[in-house]
Every structure is written in structure tokens, then in C-alpha cells.
């Protein structure tokens, strides 16, 4: 099974830039798009896959996984979340901060449901929309540029929601929870999968989602839970998914940056060390909106 970590050298380093974005005059939305946006993304993705023997005619959610599942655990984590959500073809799911749509396509292909994804970064949306057509998924996956704090959809539109490795860049956890609650139908579930603070140590930057502390919004699981409860959600489950992840991240960094000095400048070495030291943990939180589906 292919995961983001099975092809470490073609992961984050090839597709994502790490500019300094601490200018106080820059809005958070602008900073996020500057951090993640980089022209020519689709060409780089297809070229990378071609170098691995995967042609444009072979594109599926599985063959694309090495270059479009940008969260700890990759496609395996997406499958795990899908199993825990228990989706059906008649469901409508919203992916808050969808990136290029990798998880959205995987969820739609496996469950048969329709997925709507929203992301601030235009390059991600344009690339993902093209990939939807190239994989034959355009009828079940739709992507649009928008802030996850202000999604252009009516109240109670979706059966379920996911947010995968997005909250680390968004300080307004209360706003995230309020918007997810608004979008969900009664009985709907919201899966948050983020890297969360679990220990007392200070974070060393850069990290995969931030070049410096001004762009990082990592908090403890309790902060997510408090925001969720305040929005009206009920806690259903919480899972620490750290097991084995530090080793995978170290392997990924070693393969992708063999010539880079070990001086704290590699985001994956830093993240792997923090997970190993229990400073942070990839954590899933499942919340439910009261009422019957």
C-alpha cells in the first residue's frame, strides 16, 4: 500500500515552500496562501509520478497518494479516518482545508459519497480540480477556494466533516468549530486530525506547516475540545496516533534530504523528534452534532 512516507524524497520538500511569513501587516489568509502556494504544482506532481513509472493514464487516488496526501500517515491515515466515520454513498462530506483533494478523492472513491473541499490556496484548488477530471472523480468531488472560517455553503448542508492537518495554521479554533457545526446536519460527525501539543517542550522550527512560530497555531487537544463543546458539539472519541510516526518521519527526512546538515533546519527531523519526545502527537478528535441524522 502506498503512503506519503513510502516515497519520502518526493514529499513536502518538492511541492511546498517555506517562506518567512511573520510580517504583522500580512493577514493570516494571505500568509497561508503565500506559504503553500507555488506555481506549476501540477506539472511537478505529474513529473514526479512519471519518474516513478506512473503515467497520466494511470492516475487514481492510490497512485496519486505519494504526492497529494499531505498529512502524517498519508493514505493509511485517510483510510483509518474513513473507517471510523462509517460513510455511505448517500452522505455528503466537507473537507475543510482540502489541499489538492487527495483525501477527498480517496474518501469519495472508497465510500461512494460526494465530497466538497475548501482551501485558501488557489494553486491547490486549481490543481485538485484538474486531478478530479484526470481521475474521473469530478462528479463526486468538487473543490473551491474559500476560508474554512467562512465556507460558501448553507447551514446543515453536510452529513460529516473532516479537517486534516489544517488547524496547526489557524489560531481561531473557536471559529473552526462554529463553522463546522453550522455546516453539519444534526447527528453529523466532525473528525479533526492535527498535530497537537502533548508535552511542555518548546517547538523547534521550521516544521512542515510553519517556518517560524508566527505561523504556527499548535495547541493541546483540550483547546480543540473546549472550542468544540462551546460550539455545541459532543465528544465522541479521541485517538493519539503517534505510534511509529517518528520513525517514518525520520526515514522520510533522511531519504529526501541526504545532503542537508543535521542542524535543526529540516522540518521533518524536527517533527519526528518532537513526536518521539512526546512534545506533540498526531491526534484525531471525533465530535458529533446533537440530534438524529
Where are these regions (language model features)?
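N-terminal auxiliary segments of SAM/dcSAM-dependent transferases
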Residues: 11, 15-50
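Conserved alpha-helix/loop element of class I SAM-dependent methyltransferases that forms part
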Residues: 54, 71-91
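Class I SAM-dependent methyltransferase SAM/SAH-binding core
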Residues: 92-150
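A short acidic, Gly/Pro-enriched loop at the edge of an enzyme's catalytic core
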Residues: 149-161
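A short SAM/SAH-binding and catalytic strip from SAM-dependent methyltransferases
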Residues: 160-172
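A short glycine-rich, Lys/Arg-flanked "PGG" loop and its adjoining helix->strand segment in the class I
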Residues: 174-189
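Short, glycine-/aromatic-enriched active-site segment of Class I SAM-dependent methyltransferases
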Residues: 195-215
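Conserved Class I S-adenosyl-L-methionine
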Residues: 237-293
Amino acid at each position: 500500500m502506498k503512503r506519503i512516507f513510502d516515497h519520502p524524497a518526493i514529499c513536502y520538500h518538492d511541492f511546498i515552500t517555506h517562506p518567512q511569513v511573520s510580517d504583522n501587516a500580512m493577514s493570516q489568509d494571505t500568509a497561508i496562501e503565500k506559504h503553500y502556494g507555488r506555481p506549476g504544482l501540477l506539472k511537478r506532481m505529474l513529473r514526479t509520478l512519471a519518474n516513478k513509472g506512473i503515467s497520466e493514464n494511470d492516475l487514481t487516488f492510490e497512485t496519486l497518494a505519494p504526492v497529494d496526501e499531505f498529512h502524517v500517515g498519508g493514505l493509511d491515515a485517510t483510510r483509518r479516518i474513513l473507517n471510523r466515520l462509517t460513510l455511505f454513498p448517500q452522505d455528503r462530506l466537507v473537507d475543510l482545508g482540502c489541499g489538492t483533494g487527495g483525501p477527498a478523492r480517496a474518501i469519495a472513491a472508497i465510500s461512494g459519497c460526494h465530497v466538497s473541499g475548501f482551501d485558501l490556496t488557489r494553486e491547490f484548488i486549481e490543481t485538485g480540480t484538474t486531478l478530479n477530471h484526470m481521475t474521473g472523480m469530478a462528479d463526486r468531488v468538487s473543490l473551491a477556494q474559500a476560508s474554512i472560517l467562512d465556507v460558501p455553503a448553507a447551514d446543515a448542508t453536510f452529513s460529516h466533516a473532516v479537517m486534516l492537518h489544517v488547524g496547526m495554521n489557524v489560531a481561531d479554533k473557536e471559529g473552526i468549530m462554529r463553522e463546522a457545526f453550522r455546516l453539519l446536519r444534526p447527528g453529523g460527525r466532525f473528525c479533526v486530525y492535527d498535530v497537537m501539543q502533548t508535552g511542555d517542550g518548546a517547538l523547534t522550527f521550521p516544521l512542515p506547516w510553519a517556518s517560524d512560530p508566527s505561523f504556527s497555531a499548535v495547541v493541546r487537544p483540550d483547546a480543540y475540545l473546549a472550542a468544540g463543546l462551546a460550539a455545541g458539539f459532543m465528544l465522541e472519541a479521541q485517538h493519539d496516533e503517534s505510534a511509529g510516526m517518528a520513525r517514518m518521519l525520520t526515514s522520510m527526512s533522511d531519504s529526501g534530504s541526504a545532503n542537508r546538515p543535521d542542524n535543526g533546519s529540516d522540518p521533518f527531523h524536527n517533527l519526528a523528534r518532537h513526536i518521539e519526545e512526546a512534545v506533540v502527537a498526531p491526534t484525531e478528535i471525533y465530535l458529533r452534532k446533537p440530534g438524529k441524522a
